[in-house]
């Protein structure tokens, strides 16, 4: 089905950002369909397992220092292109912190202090992780001298539970999936998150410390 979709779609090239489609495209190409250029874009700062099973035209990797690692895993050097991890343009410029905080407070209708330390908790688009434990420990350490924004992604159950469990804590602000991550990074002082390649790159560009 994928092969027919690609052939019938009139595409000029295929770009894979995950191992599974890269493996699928390898199988299609081994069956004789090598005329469509296929590129893999690595979104982790390491060579992931099983990437050496793929046979594509090119591999975009995060940095030239990783060329040796990928080459040792069997990826031909001539196919390695150290161009970095792509991120959205909105992460490549920053808003002044106080301006970002004002925009966030207005957008979400929060009564939130711009003078405290703001902590941002993000556990991925699916909202996995021990967010409540992070909230509890942060409050214990900071003694209410902070504002905590917890992004639950598409995990509605987590959003409901965090909202209910923290309803008496005015400094905790759970939200669901949002497109405001660039602005939230500008507004906050520290980011608690999983160490994904893309989110780490976004945070680096926004100059926000990661825990």
Regions found by a protein language model. Give the residues of each.
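Active-site and donor-binding regions of nucleotide-sugar-utilizing enzymes
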Residues: 1-74, 79, 88
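Short glycine-/small-residue-rich Rossmann-like dinucleotide-binding loops
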Residues: 19, 124, 196
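Short gly/ser/thr-rich secondary-structure transition/capping motifs
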Residues: 39-44, 172-177, 193
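A nucleotide-sugar donor-handling region in carbohydrate enzymes
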Residues: 57-125, 154-155
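Short alpha-helical segment that forms part of, or immediately flanks, the ligand-binding pocket
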Residues: 182, 200-206
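Acidic donor-binding loop of glycosyltransferase active sites
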Residues: 186-196
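Structural loop-to-beta junction motif characteristic of Rossmann-like glycosyltransferase folds
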Residues: 189-190, 207-211
